[in-house]
Design a protein with these regions (language model features):
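Active-site anion-handling motifs in enzyme catalytic cores
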Residues: 1-285
Length: 285
C-alpha cells in the first residue's frame, strides 16, 4: 500500500516540522507491525540527504530507510499546476498513492500567517481531492480563517477530505461551526516521539529542575512577520517572557534553558539571554 505524506518535513529548519514528520512515520511503522501490512511512504519534499536521515533515525528512534522523496513545487492555482511540465513527476507520484496524509506544518491550515501560505498548502489538497485520491487531514490545528474566500476554500477541503483529525478541542469546535463533517479529536502526534534523558543537559546539575523555554522570534522580535504584526494579542509576549523568566530565576531549584525551534528564534533567544545571563542557551542545529 502506497502512502503519501505532505506538510510534514524532514528537510526543514523548523524542528517542529521535523518532529511532526518523524512522529507520523513512527506511527505508520507501528501500524505496519500491528496490522502485518507493508506501507511504502513517500514524503513530498526534497530529500535532506543521507547524513541528516541517519541523524534523525538515531536521535529520534525512527527507521527512515525504506521510504522515498518526491520534490514538490508549490503553486498558487490549479491552472498553473495543470500546465507546468515540471510538476509532472510530482503529479505522477501523487496519483500512485492509495491515500495521502496531510499535516500542513501542524498549524498552517489558516490565514494567520497570510493568504500566501494558506494557498501554498491548500491548492495541493484541492488537486488531490479533484483526482479522487483519499485525503486524510492529520492531527493539526484548524483556523482561524479571517478572509471569507479563505474560509470558503477551507470548508471545501475539510468537507471533501476522507478523514478529518484535529489535535485540540478549540479546532474541533471551530470545524463544527464552519463545516458539515464529523472530525476526530486526538493529541499532537509529536507526543509519539520518545523522551531520551541522559544527554549532557541533564548532567549539569542533577539537583535542579531543568526548565526549557522556547522564545518565539515571530512574537518577540519587532517586524519579524508582517502578517502577525497586524494582529492584536491579549498578552504582551515580550513582557510575558520577561516576567516568566524573572519569576523562575527567584527559585533556587530551577535551571533555565532558552530554546529555539526555528532558526529565526535564535536572535530572540540571544537577546533574552543578554538580559538574563543566568539562563543557558541550547545551540540551534
Amino acid at each position: 500500500m502506497k502512502v503519501g505524506l505532505i506538510g510534514a518535513f524532514l528537510n526543514n529548519s523548523n524542528m517542529g516540522c521535523v518532529a511532526l514528520a518523524c512522529s507520523i512515520i513512527r506511527l505508520l511503522q507501528e501500524i505496519e507491525e500491528e496490522e502485518k501490512i507493508k506501507l511504502d511512504v513517500t514524503l513530498f519534499e526534497a530529500s535532506p540527504g543521507k547524513e541528516k536521515l541517519e541523524l534523525y533515525s538515531r536521535e529520534l528512534d525512527v527507521d527512515l530507510q525504506n521510504f522515498s522523496f518526491s520534490e514538490t513545487a508549490w503553486v498558487y492555482n490549479l491552472r498553473a499546476l495543470a500546465h507546468w511540465k515540471r510538476h509532472e513527476e510530482m503529479k505522477a507520484n501523487l496519483k500512485k498513492c492509495d491515500f495521502i496524509i496531510d499535516m500542513t506544518g501542524g498549524d498552517s491550515f489558516s490565514d494567520i500567517y497570510g493568504k500566501k501560505r494558506f494557498y501554498f498548502w491548500s491548492n495541493i489538497k484541492k488537486y488531490i481531492i479533484k483526482k479522487k485520491i483519499p485525503l486524510i487531514l492529520g492531527p493539526q490545528t484548524y483556523g482561524p480563517y479571517e478572509n471569507k474566500r479563505v474560509k470558503k476554500f477551507a470548508k471545501y477541503i475539510i468537507e471533501k477530505s476522507s478523514v478529518v483529525i484535529v489535535r485540540d478541542e478549540k479546532s474541533l469546535k471551530y470545524i463544527k461551526e464552519i463545516a458539515n463533517v464529523q472530525a476526530k479529536l486526538t493529541t499532537d502526534v509529536a507526543f509519539q516521539l520518545p523522551c531520551q534523558k541522559g544527554t549532557e543537559i541533564f548532567l549539569n546539575n542533577e539537583k535542579k529542575k531543568k526548565i526549557g523555554i522556547n522564545v518565539s522570534g515571530l512574537l518577540y522580535l519587532e517586524n519579524s512577520d508582517s502578517s502577525l504584526s497586524e494582529k492584536s494579542f491579549k498578552t504582551d509576549y515580550k513582557e510575558y517572557i520577561h516576567d516568566l523568566i524573572s519569576e523562575l530565576l527567584k527559585k533556587d531549584d530551577c535551571e533555565i534553558y532558552l530554546i529555539g525551534h526555528v532558526k529565526c528564534d535564535m536572535e530572540a533567544v540571544e537577546k533574552v539571554q543578554k538580559l538574563y545571563p543566568k539562563c543557558h542557551t541550547i545551540p540551534w542545529q
